[in-house]
Curated annotation (Swiss-Prot):
Binding site for Zn(2+): H25, D28, H161
Protein's name in the database: 1D-myo-inositol 2-acetamido-2-deoxy-alpha-D-glucopyranoside deacetylase 2
Reactions listed under catalytic activity: 1D-myo-inositol 2-acetamido-2-deoxy-alpha-D-glucopyranoside + H2O = 1D-myo-inositol 2-amino-2-deoxy-alpha-D-glucopyranoside + acetate
Single biological process term from Gene Ontology: mycothiol biosynthetic process
Record bears the keyword Hydrolase: yes
Molecular function, one GO term: zinc ion binding
This protein's UniProt keywords: Hydrolase, Metal-binding, Zinc
UniProt xrefs under InterPro entries: GlcNAc_PI_deacetylase-related (IPR003737), LmbE-like_dom_sf (IPR024078), Mycothiol_biosynthesis_MshB (IPR017810)
Species annotation: Frankia casuarinae (strain DSM 45818 / CECT 9043 / HFP020203 / CcI3)
EC number(s) from the headed UniProt entry: 3.5.1.103
Recorded superkingdom: Bacteria
Cofactor note: Binds 1 zinc ion per subunit.
Family that this chain belongs to: Belongs to the MshB deacetylase family.
Length: 314
């Protein structure tokens, strides 16, 4: 995989349609947007850019022989996860992956309330103008019509997910403002900003299937309701966009397997894939947060394409 950086932009002309996905850590890209990434990356008229904000240094390590990489030991997990991310990108067909500000510029902040929140380089403590300028630089270079990240809570309250949301919102506005970071390139107006969404019906389906499962790291174990999960659930009526691509199911699973320190092959994610399988991992949902909604399809009226309603130009 060729990894571009803001300091060394590609000079080759980009396809007409361009989408940028902003994620907090390696592995986040595949969980909520793996189908979207793979399907758009496979389209010859679409360029996909993945921006990863940190190296995920504070992540857990599920491989016993790699436990020495943990932040509280050798603190080498971030470097290892660069390789995992490269493997995931290869599985998804992504050729343009960037780290915000370059690899290691901002560090994984850990879960809220942990000592990692106080690390001077963590994304949670980043100067927002500085971090936003780095994302704006990439937006102005790539000129995406579509920008994708998380909701205001980051899906489940992780500080880096919240920051990724804030930075993406800033980039949507600031990339079009000639007074903001003029050194970061010519202005560009993104047409649509989306937030990833976990549809309530999808969570309920998983809950009903797995609540009594003995699968390792089953998040439903001991719960009586999906509302106890601690994640943001979006009512089905509020979902604006649904992407379904069962033929990219295997690519998504292969990308998940690449993140071996984070996802146990005996754990919940793969048990879910083997259980309700394509119903769980072949459909992804989004909420259009900014921009004009395109034409819908089917009885639910949802968009079936993040580019719905757009006339894309070079």
């Amino acid at each position: 995989m060729t990894t571009a950086t803001p300091s060394s932009p590609s000079t080759a002309p980009l396809p007409t349609r361009r989408a940028m996905f902003v994620h907090a850590h390696p592995d986040d890209e595949v969980i909520s947007t793996g189908i979207a990434l793979a399907s758009y990356a496979a389209s010859p008229d679409t360029h996909v850019t993945l921006v990863t904000c940190t190296l995920g240094e504070e992540g857990e390590v599920l491989v016993p022989e790699l436990i020495h990489l943990r932040a509280d030991r050798g603190d080498q997990l971030g470097g290892y996860r660069i390789g995992e991310l490269a493997g995931a990108c290869a599985a998804l067909g992504i050729t343009d992956q960037r780290f915000l500000g370059g690899p290691g510029r901002w560090r994984d902040s850990g879960m809220i309330g942990t000592p990692a929140n106080d690390h001077p380089r963590c994304l949670w403590r980043a100067d927002l103008d500085e971090a936003a300028a780095e994302l704006v630089r990439i937006v102005r270079e790539v000129r995406p019509q579509v920008l994708v990240s998380y909701d205001a809570r980051g899906g489940y309250g992780h500080p880096d997910h919240i920051r990724a949301h804030e930075l993406t919102r800033r980039a949507f506005t600031d990339a079009a403002d000639p007074s903001f970071a003029p050194q970061a390139g010519s202005v560009w107006q993104v047409a649509k900003r989306y937030e990833t969404a976990l549809a309530r019906s999808s969570a309920v389906a998983g809950f009903e299937y797995f609540r009594d499962s003995a699968a390792e790291s089953n998040p439903f174990a001991g719960l009586t309701s999906v509302d106890e999960l601690g994640v943001t659930l979006v009512d089905d009526a509020d979902i604006t966009t649904e992407l379904s691509a069962p033929h990219f199911f295997e690519a998504k699973i292969a990308a998940m397997r690449s993140h071996r320190t984070q996802m146990s092959v005996d754990g919940f994610f793969f048990a879910l894939a083997d259980g309700i399988g394509q119903r769980a991992w072949s459909v992804e949902h989004f909420v259009l947060a900014e921009g004009a909604r395109g034409p819908g399809d089917g009885p639910d009226g949802r968009e079936r394409d993040l580019f719905a309603g757009l006339v894309c130009e070079p």
